[in-house]
């Protein structure tokens, strides 16, 4: 797998988290498999490949790839504005997090504790999701730059939905960190659009064929 493909998997995961946040905010619903994929990426230890972080295939990143394609094509009919806003905000927050070694240490320690919870309850259990959400609230939510999620207040005010949204934002920021560690940079989204799209189209097609 090329370096660019590795970057696209991580960037696709940022956009996947963003689309799931938007879906919960608008509908109160989220596919359990996609939620599990993103939460599982927070606990991946010593993966052999980037894809392994997301369960070994990118089927559950398909909606993220679609949103990323829409952003890179700059086609108003396919552009998903809120997910794009959330994705860019997560990339921005990761840059701030990178300067906070103390916070990174806290996050690492708390994720170890959550791993123990997962072994007892399961990855998408409400107690585990609440712990992920609480970790986001205690760390990244304290930055001056906050991600303002727009949607239906009936869904946003439900505590379990709020926890899922925070947990997904945490996973998106983790994927943004991975993307940058793999050599990804925001300038690519402006100056390397065609190169990214040429590599992204086959990845998106492969996830669609797997689903049939």
From Swiss-Prot:
This is High frequency lysogenization protein HflD homolog. It is found in: Cytoplasm; Cell inner membrane. The keyword Cell membrane applies. SUPFAM superfamilies: YcfC-like. It comes from Stutzerimonas stutzeri (strain A1501). It holds the Pfam family DUF489. Belongs to the HflD family. GO terms for cellular component: cytoplasm; plasma membrane. The gene is hflD. Keywords: Cell inner membrane, Cell membrane, Cytoplasm, Membrane. PANTHER family: HIGH FREQUENCY LYSOGENIZATION PROTEIN HFLD. It is a peripheral membrane protein.
